[in-house]
A protein has these predicted regions:
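Conserved SAM/SAH cofactor-binding pocket of Class I
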Residues: 95-195
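Conserved Class I SAM-dependent methyltransferase catalytic core
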Residues: 212-274
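Conserved AdoMet
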Residues: 31-105
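Conserved SAM-binding loop
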Residues: 140, 209, 235
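Mobile active-site "lid"/loop adjacent to the S-adenosyl-L-methionine
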Residues: 186-216
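Residue-level signal for inorganic ion chemistry
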Residues: 28, 66, 96, 125, ...
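Conserved hydrophobic residues forming the short capping helix/wall of the S-adenosyl-L-methionine
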Residues: 14, 107, 155, 224, ...
């Protein structure tokens, strides 16, 4: 079988489980053959050998079981860069790029800015921020040692030196350190949310946060005052139906200038507020 026929066959198979079957099929073939996408188009008639076909069949089997492409290939693009991922980390999503966009609007690239990320996972957010803000000092926390190993691997890949990765249950290991900005894409899915059925390959602890999905966010907002400088800003990603609850939690904890930002689909996705004594 040549590459062109393989793409067509896989596209038809994957159509049953994916809304982007052509893209998925190309990525799997690129992975099995260890080639670029341009190679697929310039070598359509190139035959796939037996060893490559066996690997491709194995990859296809995983995709047909609804395993995300990112876990199959072990990598995912975020903020125009490639990051390693594993089943110990969440897959970075485009919505989370809002955190970077809004943070960059609030910072001065020439100043030394201290930034804290809570729940860094594969490190995509902190590393992307560190690359954009060369003078920043970023601290990235996660409770998962396995996730931090992936984050450190990504830091090495992108030659990052201004991110400090720390194993910590939220703020626990920070002592009295304070930051100009705190940001997080925390767990915010409800315990029995039906959407979890489609996320069964991803780490549950990084997704679910209590019956209403707000346990982690409550903790983050209530305790941020001990680790943020006066006038500092806290930015939190959340579910599209959680805006009112997030505003209530911020107000209960006396935060100022509470603002919600919508994602590209027009859903409330990020809320930020300023701490002022």
């Amino acid at each position: 079988m040549d590459i062109d026929k393989a793409i067509k066959k896989l596209t038809e198979d994957i159509r049953k489980v994916s809304c982007s079957p052509r893209l998925d099929s190309e990525i799997l073939i690129m992975e099995a053959l260890n080639v670029s996408r341009s190679y697929l188009y310039t070598h359509k008639d190139k035959s796939i050998n037996l060893k490559q076909k066996k690997l491709l069949d194995a990859l296809l089997k995983r995709r047909m079981q609804n395993e995300p492409i990112a876990y199959i290939t072990g990598k995912k693009e975020f903020w125009s860069r490639e990051f390693y991922v594993s089943r110990d980390t969440l897959i970075p999503r485009p919505e989370s790029e809002l955190l970077i966009e809004e943070l960059l609007k609030l910072t001065n690239k020439q100043e030394t800015t201290k930034i804290l990320e809570l729940g860094t996972g594969c490190g995509a957010l902190s590393i992307s921020i560190a690359l954009e803000l060369n003078n920043s000092l970023v601290t990235a926390l996660d409770i998962s040692r396995k996730a931090l190993k992936i984050a450190l691997k990504n830091a090495k890949k992108h030659q990052i030196e201004n991110v400090n990765f720390l194993e910590s249950d939220w703020y626990k290991e920070l002592n009295k350190k304070k930051f100009d900005f705190i940001l997080s894409n925390p767990p915010y899915v409800k315990k029995n949310d039906p959407s979890l059925d489609a996320l069964n390959f991803e780490p549950l602890k990084a997704l679910v946060s209590g019956i209403d999905g707000l346990d982690s966010i409550r903790h983050i907002i209530a305790n941020a005052k001990y680790h943020i400088k006066n006038g500092g800003t806290l930015l939190i990603e959340h579910g599209k139906d959680q805006k009112k609850d997030i505003f209530d939690i911020f107000n209960t904890n006396s935060w100022k200038n509470i603002t919600c930002i919508e994602d590209l689909r027009g859903f409330p996705r990020l809320t930020m507020a300023k701490y002022a004594t």
